[in-house]
């Protein structure tokens, strides 16, 4: 059974890039904003969430807060993406409950390692 990854980004090009890259190894669902993603989460549970910070309707910060308040998604790993690379934004994401943060443009190999680290933490730790 393949792991399911939820992608949330208002930029269609980023969603398509991520879908193409990740669909080789994972089942991928993509949404264009936090509200649509929360509706989808009502009946679905991904193994990992990749979410943009700056989006219309509901930004990534608000999305994380909502996800962490729900019992069934409380421990789902979240990787945040942002076009703004600064420590303030990164720290805010971590404080709200994100496991990782990547600045756009990102290296797909780095994203791949972050996904593996979050989906298989014990196995990943044993690599070293």
Predicted segments with their positions:
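Two-component/phosphorelay signaling modules centered on CheY-like receiver
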Residues: 12-29
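Acidic, metal-coordinating helix/loop segments flanking the phosphotransfer/catalytic sites
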Residues: 30-48
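Conserved Asp/Asn-Gly motif in the active-site loop of CheY-like receiver
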Residues: 31-35, 90, 108
């Amino acid at each position: 059974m393949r792991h399911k990854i939820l992608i949330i980004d208002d930029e269609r090009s980023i969603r398509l890039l991520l879908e193409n890259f990740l669909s080789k190894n994972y089942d991928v669902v993509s949404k264009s904003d936090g509200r649509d993603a929360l509706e989808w989460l009502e009946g679905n549970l991904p193994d990992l969430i990749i979410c943009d910070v700056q989006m219309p309707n509901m930004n990534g910060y608000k999305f994380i807060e909502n996800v962490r308040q729900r019992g069934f998604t409380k421990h789902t790993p979240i990787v945040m993406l942002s076009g703004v690379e600064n420590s303030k934004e990164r720290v805010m994401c971590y404080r709200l409950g994100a496991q990782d943060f990547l600045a756009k443009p990102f290296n797909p190999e780095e994203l791949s390692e972050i996904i593996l680290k979050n989906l298989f933490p014990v196995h990943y730790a044993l690599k070293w």
